[in-house]
UniProtKB/Swiss-Prot annotation:
<dbReference type="GO" id="GO:0003735">
    <property type="term" value="F:structural constituent of ribosome"/>
</dbReference>
<dbReference type="Pfam" id="PF01196">
    <property type="entry name" value="Ribosomal_L17"/>
</dbReference>
<dbReference type="InterPro" id="IPR047859">
    <property type="entry name" value="Ribosomal_bL17_CS"/>
</dbReference>
<keyword id="KW-0689">Ribosomal protein</keyword>
<dbReference type="GO" id="GO:0006412">
    <property type="term" value="P:translation"/>
</dbReference>
<dbReference type="GO" id="GO:0022625">
    <property type="term" value="C:cytosolic large ribosomal subunit"/>
</dbReference>
<dbReference type="InterPro" id="IPR036373">
    <property type="entry name" value="Ribosomal_bL17_sf"/>
</dbReference>
<comment type="subunit">
    <text>Part of the 50S ribosomal subunit. Contacts protein L32.</text>
</comment>
<keyword id="KW-0687">Ribonucleoprotein</keyword>
<comment type="similarity">
    <text>Belongs to the bacterial ribosomal protein bL17 family.</text>
</comment>
<protein>
    <recommendedName>
        <fullName>Large ribosomal subunit protein bL17</fullName>
    </recommendedName>
</protein>
<dbReference type="InterPro" id="IPR000456">
    <property type="entry name" value="Ribosomal_bL17"/>
</dbReference>
Length: 113
C-alpha cells in the first residue's frame, strides 16, 4: 500500500499540482478543491508550516525547493509560522461545500486555522 494518493496523474504532474495547491493555500489562506486533493495538500502544507516554525536556513531552503514563489516562503517564515508557535500540528481546517456541478465531485474548502 502506497504512502500517498496517486490522484490519477503521473508523478511529475501530481507533484506540480500539489506544489501549486500548497503555494496557493499559503498565499491566499484558503483554497477550494476536491476532498482527496485537499487531504494530500493538507499533509504537505502542515509539513511546510512545521519547517517555517523551525526557522533556520536549511528549513527555508527546503521550503523553497517545494513552494514556487519566494514571497510566499518569506510570508510563511515571517508571518504564518509564528502564528502557530504554540500549536503542535493541526494548522488547517476542511469544510465540505457539496458536490461540484459539472461532475458531482465532493468539493471542500481547505483553509489555515
Amino acid at each position: 500500500m502506497a504512502g500517498y494518493r496517486k490522484l490519477g496523474l503521473p508523478t511529475d504532474q501530481r507533484r506540480a499540482m500539489l506544489r501549486n495547491l500548497v503555494t496557493s493555500l499559503l498565499k491566499h489562506g484558503k483554497i477550494e478543491t476536491t476532498v482527496t486533493r485537499a487531504k494530500e495538500t493538507r499533509s504537505i502544507a502542515e509539513k511546510m508550516i512545521t519547517l517555517g516554525k523551525r526557522g533556520d536556513l536549511h528549513a527555508r531552503r527546503q521550503a523553497l525547493a517545494f513552494i514556487q514563489e519566494e514571497l510566499v516562503v518569506k510570508n510563511l517564515f515571517d508571518n504564518v509560522a509564528p502564528k502557530y508557535a504554540e500549536r503542535n500540528g493541526g494548522y488547517t481546517r476542511m469544510y465540505k461545500k457539496g458536490p461540484r456541478r459539472g461532475d458531482g465531485a465532493e468539493v471542500v474548502i481547505l483553509e489555515l486555522v
